[in-house]
């Protein structure tokens, strides 16, 4: 019977142990997996559906900024790394909740002094147990601290997801801007080529000098050089966009990108400035992460204060000595005589003060970032509106020149010059629009709330409507 009990206890002990399973890292296999990523992944389609972007066709025929952002959230290696930190923090909660294991010791002793009968062995056999008992609620304090640190890791995951979104938006805007500028410059090159041919024709007819022809040729070559530079930037921004999405550049070969999102910009008057700043100061992801870390420092201080009270160790034991059964029960505690844990308490208190100072400094930085971003956005929007008015006037002027040309009042060279002026105004308009999008992106980064809805109007960034939702989850299996 006793052997069966020992066998059952041994099996329970072995069954509770975790076995080691090797997971070798193969660089070649990992590289193949990264290079084979495609935008028509069935898992990505399910991810889009879960986020309310159910495609009518698969693969999608057109991808807008919202779609590409979801692709990045699905594929991003940065998010995968941060999820491992979240999983590590969750494991830390398990570690914090563990109770100390009891210990068992066995001993033998030889009693050579006492004269015992011949049939009595001089050897004594015994065993001791050590049962540690934590006091002052230390286990609960450790669990709360670990939960606060896990909460900070989860907010850091959200911060990483926001950074992924921001990076995709920034590179998407740069890519679209490059496409539009290239198209505009292609038209300018075509117009300047026609102007050069007109001057060549006039020079052959003796109606102009070679200086005019050479100046037109220089202007044409300058436009071509600028076009080459813009096309190079466009290609580089395409690669950068693919990298921001966690895809190889070739994955975008069959992707048709919708550029309509770039044209959306809310009026500064539509932005609820008090709500914007308040939301940033109280609900930004890094603010909430700092709050969790401060709460963890509070629990760490509480734990060090609790460590003033020593843990108790119960020590029941049994010995068999020359036919006598000896039972024992004792306990031990460390004596807080030489120190009462003053050093660790002082360190924990200063760490809490440091966490408070870091939180206050972060809030001040956020406040300045929001105010600066708002000022830059208003200025960029004012410049953009001025360029938009100028573009409308330039279009009207070009139409007037077209009518005059049709009536024979101006020559073709004047018509082409008006087209060049219109293209130059469009180039300035595109640059102003790019600047608006950049400053809007900076403002959104300052608040960490999307400020443009599908209608292009400003959104209320109150935490009740936006920030209490948690859009960043682990959707990609490991």
Spell out what each predicted region is.
Residues 51-61, 93, 105-135, 142, ...:
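Small/polar, glycine/serine/threonine/aspartate-rich low-complexity segments that form flexible
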Residues 18, 139, 148, 155-279, ...:
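Periplasmic alpha-helical coiled-coil/stalk elements that build and connect Gram-negative outer-membrane
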Residues 203-207, 405-409, 446, 450:
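A short glycine-centered flexible hinge/capping loop motif at secondary-structure junctions
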Residues 73-81, 87-102, 115-119, 127-145, ...:
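A glycine-/polar-enriched beta->alpha junction
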Residues 69, 126-128, 172, 277, ...:
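Membrane-embedded beta-strand positions in outer-membrane beta-barrel channels/transporters
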Residues 230, 285, 432:
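Metallo-beta-lactamase
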Residues 1-71, 231-279, 442-478:
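Terminal intrinsically disordered/low-complexity segments used for targeting and assembly
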Residues 344-386, 390:
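C-terminal structural cap/anchor segments
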């Amino acid at each position: 019977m006793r052997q069966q009990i020992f066998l059952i206890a041994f099996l329970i002990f072995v069954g509770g142990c975790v076995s080691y399973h090797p997971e070798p890292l193969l660089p070649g296999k990992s590289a193949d997996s990264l290079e084979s990523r495609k935008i028509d992944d069935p898992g990505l389609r399910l991810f889009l559906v879960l986020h309310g972007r159910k495609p009518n066709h698969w693969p999608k025929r057109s991808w807008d900024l919202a779609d590409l952002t979801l692709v990045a959230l699905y594929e991003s290696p940065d998010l995968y790394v941060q999820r491992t930190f979240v999983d590590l923090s969750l494991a830390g909660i398990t570690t914090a909740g563990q109770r100390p294991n009891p210990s068992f010791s066995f001993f033998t002793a030889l009693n050579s002094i006492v004269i015992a009968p011949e049939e009595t062995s001089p050897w004594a056999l015994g065993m001791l147990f050590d049962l540690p008992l934590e006091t002052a609620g230390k286990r609960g304090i450790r669990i709360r601290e670990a939960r606060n640190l896990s909460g900070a890791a989860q907010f850091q995951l959200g911060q990483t997801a926001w950074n992924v979104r921001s990076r995709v938006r920034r590179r998407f805007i740069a890519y679209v801007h490059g496409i539009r500028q290239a198209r505009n410059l292609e038209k300018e090159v075509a117009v300047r080529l026609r102007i050069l041919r007109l001057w060549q024709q006039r020079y052959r007819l003796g109606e102009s000098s070679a200086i005019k022809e050479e100046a037109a040729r220089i202007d044409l070559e300058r436009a071509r050089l600028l076009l080459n530079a813009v096309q190079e930037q466009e290609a580089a921004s395409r690669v950068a966009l693919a990298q921001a999405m966690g895809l190889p550049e070739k994955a975008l070969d069959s992707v048709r990108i919708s550029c309509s999102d770039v044209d959306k910009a809310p009026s500064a008057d539509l932005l609820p400035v008090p709500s914007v700043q308040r939301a940033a100061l109280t609900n930004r992801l890094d603010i909430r992460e700092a709050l969790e870390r401060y709460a963890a420092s509070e629990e760490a201080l509480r734990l060090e204060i609790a460590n003033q009270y020593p843990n108790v160790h119960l020590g029941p034991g049994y010995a068999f000595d020359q036919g006598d059964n000896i039972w024992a029960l004792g306990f031990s505690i460390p004596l807080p005589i030489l120190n009462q844990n003053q050093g660790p308490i002082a360190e924990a208190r200063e760490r809490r003060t440091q966490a408070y100072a870091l939180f206050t400094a972060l809030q001040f930085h956020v406040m300045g970032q929001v105010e600066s971003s708002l000022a830059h956005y208003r200025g960029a929007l004012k410049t953009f509106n001025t360029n938009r008015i100028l573009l409308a006037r330039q279009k009207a002027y070009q139409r007037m020149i077209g009518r005059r040309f049709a009536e024979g009042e101006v020559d073709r060279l004047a018509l082409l010059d008006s087209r060049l002026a219109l293209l130059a105004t469009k180039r300035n308009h595109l640059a102003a629009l790019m600047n608006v999008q950049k400053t809007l992106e900076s403002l959104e980064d300052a608040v960490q709330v999307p400020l443009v809805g599908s209608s292009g109007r400003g959104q209320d960034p109150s935490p009740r409507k936006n920030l209490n939702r948690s859009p960043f989850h682990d959707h990609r299996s490991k």
